[in-house]
Amino acid sequence: MKFSTDRIITTHAGSLPRPPELLKLIRAKVAGQPHDEKGLEAEITSSIEQCVKRQADIGLDVISDGEFSKPSFLSYIVERLDGVTPTDEPFGQPWKGSREHNQWSEYYAWEAQVGIALAPVTATKRVVCSGPVKYKGHDKVKADIARFKAALGKVKVEEAFLPAISPTQVEFWIRNQHYKSERDYIFALADALHDEYKAITDSGLLLQIDDPRLVTQYVMDASMSIADCRKWAEVRVEALNHALRDIPEDKIRYHTCYSIDMGPRTNDMEAKDIVDIILKIKAIAYSFEGANPRHEHEWKVWNAAKLPQHKVLIPGVITHSTVLVEHPELVCDRILRYAQGLGRERVIAGADCGFGTFAGMQTIHPTVAWAKLEALVEGARMASRQLWGRAAA
């Protein structure tokens, strides 16, 4: 993976706003309505090509396919696994009963009435693990890779990455009804997902592991203490590292965040309580929230953490948690805090979270999301001028 050797390079968290026509076709497929599968595939290909070009045009260095082939960053995995069964049971509201919902129930009731009008395009029924888990998505991940690399062949960027879901997140999404223990289940998922991870890195692309649940378990399960969550997280990190076996560390970036909730967020697990466990994950780079009001101050925690010398951080310097477009000078200041603590070569400028995590659920309008990414690029150029004493390329 490339580092910021002569300037601060830029990236983001993976998902980007999907075009309206693509959303329409994805919505029809997820709803089980008649749709043109060939037309959908063609639209995915065209949309990825446009997305890749736009990322390159605004100056992003390390880019993704926008996750345009997936209804969401996690539900896509259901059709890539054997041993899972959809049910008629509603998935429900995962935030209900969480620490956040319990403290701010009046706010969330109000938000439900006046908040986001667009429902996410994703499965609303519970999926269960009903048998041995095996990966069967080889053709689908090959198609993702082929589409992305075809689009990359038409632009000039530093590197490219494909996101893939973590075993821990799948464990949350697909309820275990087959394995005797949580440990057996999470390691079975790790074995299955290894195939997807290795296919991505074998193609020459970087792999990004998407793992919000590692830090959201604390807020989601009000019965667990910090100590409980740390013990729980240790097992999940062990399983993830098992899934990443025989994959070169320098091909892996790890992303965690506190979800797309735009609520008060006063119950988020603090970085100081989990950073040492995160750094046990086999990855060359760690992407995390660093630009929103609940976590911006944690640059001090990350700078003080014992990050191995050969690894880098990808702090969020723009955020999905507000529609305000960050001023490039603010982006620059955020980058400088990390660079002054870790060294300029060990910082890559990133985003807190994706801007299209669930197709159709847009807390940030596409025009605003792209403006934020432009501010990210300009802020990185400003930081580069200060850190290297010359204009960035």
Place the predicted regions along the sequence by residue:
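Domain-level signal for soluble alpha/beta catalytic cores
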Residues: 1-393
